[in-house]
Regions:
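Cytosolic, long alpha-helical scaffolding segments
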Residues: 1-165
Length: 165
C-alpha cells in the first residue's frame, strides 16, 4: 500500500500533467483558429469551435481535483502555492480556449459576409501569433512552476524576458 505522501505527490503530478495537457489544447486551438483565419478554412474554424467544450471540460476536471486536494490534504506552504497557482492558471488557459473559439467564429462570420478586411486580419493575425508565443511559454514553464516555484519567477519577481515577443 503506497504511503499517503506518495499518493499525494502522485495527485500533484497528475494535476500538473492535466494542466500542461490543457495548455497544449488551448495552444493548438489558437494555432488552428489562426490557420483558419489565414486560409479562410471554414471546416477548421468549425472544429475549433467544437473543441472548445473539451477545454471547458478540462477546466472543470482540474478545478475539481484542486478542490479535492485542498479539502482532503489541506496543503500548506509550497504545495498550497502549487494548487492555488493551478486554480488561477486553469481559468486563464480556459479563457484562451474561449478566445480561440471567438477567432474561429469570426472566420465563420467573415466568410458568410464575404468581406475583404485585409488590414484588420493582419492585425488580428499578428496579435494571435503573439498570444500563441505566450501560450507556448506558459505551457513550457508550467511544468517547473507546478513542481516547485522557480526562484527567478517567484511571486512578483517575474522575469519578463521569459516572454519573448
Amino acid at each position: 500500500m503506497p504511503s499517503v505522501r506518495k499518493s499525494y505527490d502522485e495527485e500533484l503530478l497528475q494535476l500538473d500533467t492535466l494542466l500542461a495537457r490543457m495548455g497544449h489544447e488551448a495552444g493548438a486551438a489558437i494555432e488552428s483558429a489562426l490557420t483558419a483565419l489565414r486560409n479562410d478554412d471554414i471546416e477548421l474554424a468549425r472544429s475549433v469551435v467544437a473543441r472548445d467544450s473539451q477545454i471547458d471540460a478540462s477546466e472543470h476536471e482540474i478545478e475539481h481535483r484542486c478542490l479535492q486536494l485542498l479539502l482532503r490534504q489541506q496543503p500548506v506552504a509550497s504545495d498550497l502555492r502549487k494548487v492555488s497557482t493551478a486554480l488561477k492558471m486553469v481559468t486563464d488557459v480556459e479563457r484562451i480556449g474561449d478566445q480561440a473559439s471567438d477567432i474561429a467564429e469570426l472566420v465563420l462570420h467573415l466568410h458568410a459576409k464575404s468581406t475583404d478586411a485585409v488590414g484588420v486580419l493582419e492585425d488580428i493575425l499578428k496579435m494571435g501569433d503573439d498570444v500563441l508565443k505566450m501560450v507556448n511559454v506558459l505551457v513550457y514553464n508550467s511544468q517547473p512552476m507546478l513542481c516547485g516555484i522557480l526562484p527567478k519567477h517567484h511571486a512578483l519577481g517575474l522575469d519578463t524576458a521569459a516572454f519573448p515577443l
